[in-house]
Structures are given as structure tokens and as C-alpha cells.
Amino acid sequence: MDILNTVETFDATTHRMAETYTDTPDPERNRIVRRWHVEPIPLAELKAARKAVATAKRYEVETGGILMAGTVIRTDRESQGLINGAYGLARDMLAGGVPAAPIDFKGADGWAEIPPSVMVDIGRAVGLHVQACFRAERQLHEAIDAAEDAAAVLGVDIAAGWPG
């Protein structure tokens, strides 16, 4: 005897196919009609999934670079580390703890000699950019956590509020 699997149409953002079903014999066609049940996705799972999307968006924006005075500044994790090191060195140079000299730096557009004062500006801009990304992610996570139902969770605009 054949089994005809069916499932009612549902919104996959808020519901999913359950692991349960109802079988109805259809002897005229020598088959069983299996109707799979649909269940709402638990609110905690919806929230976790939306927060994961917000986190992925934060990483995308955080590491996507910034534009500063017409120059692209890389903000991937490796570049953040290199910029942070050069920023610390530039601050030491400006404070007189290290002899002042242009900082050799390889950026998105190639090699550059960056004056210490400009390197400090770049370091601050990158740091502020990264902080703004984490602030936006935190605000989204808090809004998702505060949502009382699926519609409110899905109503949180993950594309809004990012620096850039």
C-alpha cells in the first residue's frame, strides 16, 4: 500500500512541520494519506535564530571596512589588530615615549607612511566603528529578548541602526 504524504501550507518563519502525523486510509486508491502536523516554532528558538542573524550582521558590518577622508580602512579582525598596535605606537610617539617617525602601514590601497597623529585618528575611528557595531548588536539582542511573541521578534529590524 502506498503512502501519500501531505502537509498543509504554513509560514516557515513562525511554524515548522512536526514529527507527528495522522494517517487516513484511502481504500479506493489503495493508499494511506499521511497528513503531517504543523507546529509553531517555540519563541525561544525564534529569538535564538534572530539573534544569530543580528550577530552575523554585526560581524559583516564590523569587518566590512570604513571610509576615512576618502581612504578605505580595512576592519577585518587581522587589520583591527594591526591598527590597534600602530595606534598604541603612535600614541607613545605623541607622548614622547618613543621617537616620533612616520608609521609604515600597508592598507587596502597599498603602502603608506602615516604620521603618528593621523594613525591615532585612524585607530580611534576603527575603535569607534567596532564599538558602534557591538552597541547595535546589543540593542538588537535586547529588543529581541523583550519581544513577547513571534510577530514582535520578526518585527525587529536587523538591517537598521548600523554604523556606516
Task: Put a short name on every predicted segment.
Residues 1-164:
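A preference for well-ordered globular domain cores
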